[in-house]
Amino acid sequence: EIGPKGKKVVAVASDWPGLERGAKTGQDAIERLRSYSLRYSQVAKRAEMEAEFDAITNVDVVEQYSGTGSTDFWGISFAFSSIDKQDMSGDELERELTLMQACWAFFDDVRKRVSAEMQKGPRGGGRDRDHIVQHALSTEQKAFAKMVGVLTADDALATDSGLKAYRDAYDQAIRSYHAQGKLAGKVAKWPLRYLIRHAAFHTLDHAWEMEDKDLTAK
């Protein structure tokens, strides 16, 4: 995905929701994505797809498409590829959902083992663990799940049981939209493939942020 001004390019692993990295050039984006393969293998393992993922040896560019202004600004995928727009079979949908669930499980594991205080930036800024967790969950709840009709009270995600119930409802809503052939959202219409990979990316990006800023061993 190439930003309209060419400032940022995002490499997206279309078969592996959540694995996408941005950089200033296409080659740098691909190399950055490859550098995260070992980290993503932990997600694939949770999804019981580790052997399939670890068997990948080459990165092939199958499509180049235009991004949005946000692509250039954030270095994050904000546009739909032709693959995102392809129809999914029931089995393909379940594979995507299984990987998104694995991203959630990885996120939950990370937030339980990292330090509450996170390493600050060079100017002393940055969020601590609880703020990162709150942001990640709230954004998914209010921006992504809402697009498939899942409306949840703000405090419902504060307990393990509430979080599980919310995620189960989110999964089921995506299945329902898929069965009806519907796109996510009332105004901005998102293909379900994109909704899943964007939510998975957001979850993983903040899980990796917490790992990178963890002060447990320092």
Predicted regions: what they are:
Residues 1-49, 97, 108, 112-164, ...:
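Short, contiguous alpha-helical
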Residues 2-6, 13, 69, 73-80, ...:
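N-proximal short alpha-helices
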Residues 99-110, 165-173:
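Amphipathic alpha-helical packing segments from all-alpha helical-bundle domains
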Residues 38-92:
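Short, charged, surface-exposed hinge/linker loops at domain edges
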Residues 172-183:
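Transmembrane alpha-helical segments of integral membrane proteins
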Residues 54-60, 114, 181, 188:
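Generic structural motif recognizing short loop/turn segments at the entrances and edges of beta-strands
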